[in-house]
Swiss-Prot record:
Top-level taxonomy: Bacteria, Bacillati, Actinomycetota, Actinomycetes, Mycobacteriales
The family this protein is said to belong to: Belongs to the enoyl-CoA hydratase/isomerase family.
Full protein name: Probable enoyl-CoA hydratase EchA17
Catalysed transformations (reactions): a (3S)-3-hydroxyacyl-CoA = a (2E)-enoyl-CoA + H2O; a 4-saturated-(3S)-3-hydroxyacyl-CoA = a (3E)-enoyl-CoA + H2O
Keywords: Fatty acid metabolism, Lipid metabolism, Lyase
Length: 261
């Protein structure tokens, strides 16, 4: 992998394979040391990066990564403490847009989680299709410790994965929990040695680099619709996507067409 694309200016990079190996593999890299704390600017850059990755025809699968040391410690609390109620509402909207943008990337996505995934960092990881964690990672829905609650659809995503009782306990307490518990709760899908996190995520993503892009995008959107649409609307959307994918395959475009909504 090579060639950082400087389309997002400061804290979030899009890194796309140069084609020498793993053609089609890309990375959305959080880069705000030391903890990848999330500010309004970081969220805006996440939106821009996710949208770019969704559009690019040279991208087939995406790794969401915060680097070797830490995924994200969540929201930047010093910034939050300076906000008025109106500004906090705007910040919550931007946070939601970032999480939604990652979830809407019409390609397989995997979060490679190192160090800590706390608060909004955990929510962002839950927006990926698959999550690989180091066995030393600490997780937490920690917003309550600052007198807040998860936003960015964080409580819904946590509840879908862990169930309502477990989600309430985690949110009410804000406690840290380890990767083994995260795996048991269904919040992560694989647990590996800390030095193997990125490689394990890349191995998962490689499985789909040669897949039919239009069909993968349609399948991803259809599964997401299970939680988002009423049954009749969901079934109609599924049927529409099936016909679109069928037509793309008939036209010989199964590899070249990208999209799904």
């Amino acid at each position: 992998m090579a060639a950082v694309t400087p389309t997002v200016p400061e804290f979030v990079n899009v890194v796309v394979s140069d084609g020498s190996q793993d053609a089609g593999l890309a990375m959305l890299l959080l880069s705000r040391p030391p903890t990848n704390a999330m500010t309004r600017q970081v969220y805006r850059e996440v939106v821009a990066a996710a949208n770019e990755l969704g559009r690019r025809d040279d991208v087939a699968a995406v790794i969401l990564y915060g680097g070797h040391e830490i995924f994200s410690a969540g929201d930047d609390m010093p910034e939050l403490r300076t906000l008025s109620a109106q500004e906090a509402d705007t910040a919550a909207r931007i946070r939601q847009q970032a999480v939604d943008a990652v979830a809407a990337i019409p390609k397989p996505t995997v979060a490679a989680i190192t160090g800590y995934a706390l608060g909004a960092g955990l929510t962002l990881a839950l927006a990926a299709d698959w999550r690989v964690s180091g066995d030393n990672v600490k997780f937490g829905a920690t917003e309550i410790l600052a007198g807040l609650i998860p936003s960015g659809d964080g409580m819904a995503r946590l509840t879908r994965a862990a169930g309502p009782s477990r989600a309430k306990e985690l949110v009410f307490s804000g406690r840290f929990f380890d990767a083994e518990e995260a795996l048991a709760l269904g919040l992560i899908d694989d647990m590996v040695a800390p030095d193997d996190v990125y490689d394990a995520a890349a191995a998962w993503a490689r499985r789909f680099l040669d897949g039919p892009p239009h069909a993968l995008a349609a399948a991803k959107a259809g599964i997401s619709d299970v939680y988002e649409l009423a049954p009749a609307e969901r079934i109609a959307a599924e049927r529409r996507r099936y016909v679109e994918v069928f037509a793309a395959g008939q036209g010989g475009g199964s590899k070249g067409d990208r999209g799904g909504r």
